[in-house]
Amino acid sequence: LEALLKAKLLEKGYDVQNIDMTVGTSYTAVGEALSAGSADIGFISGGNYVLFSDDCDVLLTALRYGINKDSENAADWNDGTLEENTQDMTTYYRSIILAGPSAKGQALLAKVNSGEELTWDDLNSATWSVLAPTSASGYIYPSLWLQEHYGKTIADLDHVVQSDSHSTSLARLATGQADVMVSFGHIRIKNAPNWQEKFGGTAPMVEQTGIIGVTDGIYNDMIAYSKTSDLMACLL
C-alpha cells in the first residue's frame, strides 16, 4: 500500500519519500492517534470525527447516493410514502428517530404530525432501542439531538434497550418491545419489504412507522488530518 500511495502521489506531483501505514484496531483508535499527533492522516467515521474534531479536521469525505427526504422537520418525512434513493451524491446522511406501531409510538407520531412539539416527558416515557455508544446514527447523533432540544442525552432516558444491530432494533420496534428506535435515515428503504415477514409487523412499514426526530447531517467516512501533528502543521 505504501508503494501504491507513493506512486499515486507522484502522479500528482508530490514526491513523498517515506510513508508508514498502520491499521488501527478501530475507528476510535485511529481518532485517538490523530488526537495525540502520533498519526498524521487517518481514515475515520463521521461519528468519530464528532468525538475528535478538536484535534483533527477533514481532508476528503466519501460520497454516497442521497435520499429524497432531507428536511430537519420530522413531519415533512411523514407524507405517506417511503423514502427513495436518488442519483444525487452527498457527503452526509442523517439519523432519524423512528416511532413504531405501539400505542406510545403512535401517540408520539400523531403529536409530531399535528405540529405539536414533543416534550422531554413525552420522550422519556417511551422505550427506546439504541445501538452501542460508538454508533453514529444509532447513538451519538440522536444523543446530540436530545442535547440540542432538551439539554439531555440518551443516558438520561429512563427506558433504553441496547440492540446489537439495526435489524434487532427493527424487530423490537415491529413487535412493540420498543416504542421508538434510532437509525440511519434510509433504514426503511432497505427493510420495508421485510417488515412483516421478517420483523413481525402486522401491516406495511409505511403505515406502522413514522419519523419523530431528524438529526444534523452525519459526515460519511473520511480522510482526516491531525491538528497536533508537527508534520501536518508544516504542510498546511
Report residues per predicted region.
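Short, polar/charged alpha-helical segment
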Residues: 1-17, 144
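Extracytoplasmic
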Residues: 16, 36, 44, 92-94, ...
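Short helices/loops that flank or line small-molecule/ion binding pockets
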Residues: 20-42, 50-55, 165-190, 194-195
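Solvent-exposed coil/turn segments that connect beta secondary-structure elements
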Residues: 44-48, 63-65, 100-103, 133, ...
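Short beta-strand->loop
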Residues: 57-90, 103, 159, 193-217
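Pocket-lining segment of extracytoplasmic ligand-binding domains
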Residues: 112-119, 124-234
